[in-house]
């Protein structure tokens, strides 16, 4: 009896088509709604990507949630090490920093601003960027407002010079009037100086020129001059923006699951792309387009 049982166990674990799940730690600094939503979608997508072939003897992935306690980052790293995960999903900048304190474990990150400052090149570390490339934003804008050819923007050279430097090359068919300042107080007047010179005003994700003090100036200019206002955040549509081209968090979670499977299945190593562009969603504020008397070329997007 024992001999037969032993043979059965050996045969079971030697099946070439058996698919084992992975041990994954989801590391985050809070249990916010967005973190939980991303975690759920990531886990569901990962389960869908388990190889299904042969006898399909499937062991599901084991996902352990670790929430960072302020001041106890060392305790978090020790707990993760005790789990011996195959991969860490880090949600947010603090989570990425803590994840990189755990040696040798591959990391996939989401919701991290400027992650390139934290990347460890000695192991697989990758993630989805929070920055939508300028060309993607401009191409989406053109899809809805094809008659726009002159675009105005105000920017801080210390924060956004890299974005501005590439505009002429990514969209040579457009004219850009880019006004530089490092002083928040100058932003309203610079916006006003664009009157009659542009067909669209563009808000950059620049803390000097786009903030709670300057938002009203953008909206007033758009309304007075009957031109659309392009922004990077859905929330700013409620403050008078006309179109938002922003990252899609649900699709980012699915994209992260794909990156994780690439690492776990050894399809990539330390040479993998450190940062990939995010999937985007475009939202039109149809109330504002009506108020501005502007027609749009693509009406598939729902009202905001």
Model regions and ranges:
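Short hydrophobic alpha-helices and adjacent helix-cap/hinge residues
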Residues: 19-304
């Amino acid at each position: 009896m024992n001999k037969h049982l032993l043979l059965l166990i050996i045969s079971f674990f030697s099946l070439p088509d058996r698919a084992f799940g992975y041990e994954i730690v989801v590391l985050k600094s809070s249990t916010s709604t967005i973190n939980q939503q991303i975690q759920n979608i990531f886990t569901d997508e990962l389960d869908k990507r388990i190889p299904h072939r042969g006898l399909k003897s499937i062991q599901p992935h084991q996902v352990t949630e670790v929430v960072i306690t302020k001041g106890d980052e060392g305790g978090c790293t020790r707990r993760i090490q005790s789990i011996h995960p195959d991969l860490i999903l880090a949600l947010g900048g603090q989570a990425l920093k803590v994840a990189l304190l755990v040696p040798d474990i591959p990391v996939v990150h989401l919701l991290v601003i400027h992650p390139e400052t934290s990347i460890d090149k000695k192991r697989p570390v990758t993630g989805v960027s929070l920055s939508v490339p300028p060309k993607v934003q401009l191409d989406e804008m053109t899809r809805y407002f094809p008659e726009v050819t002159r675009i105005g923007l105000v920017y801080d050279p210390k924060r956004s010079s890299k974005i501005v430097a590439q505009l002429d090359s990514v969209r040579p068919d457009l004219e850009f009037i880019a006004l530089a300042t490092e002083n928040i107080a100058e932003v309203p007047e610079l916006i006003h100086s664009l009157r009659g010179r542009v067909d669209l005003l563009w808000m950059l994700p620049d803390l000097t020129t786009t903030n709670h003090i300057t938002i009203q100036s953008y909206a007033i200019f758009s309304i007075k001059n009957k031109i659309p206002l392009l922004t990077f955040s859905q929330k700013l549509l409620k403050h008078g923006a006309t179109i938002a081209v922003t990252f899609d968090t649900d699709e980012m979670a699915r994209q992260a699951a794909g990156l994780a499977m690439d690492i776990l299945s050894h399809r990539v190593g330390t040479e993998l792309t450190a940062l990939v562009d995010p999937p985007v969603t475009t939202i039109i504020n149809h109330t504002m387009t009506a108020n501005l008397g502007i027609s749009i070329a693509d009406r598939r997007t729902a009202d905001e």
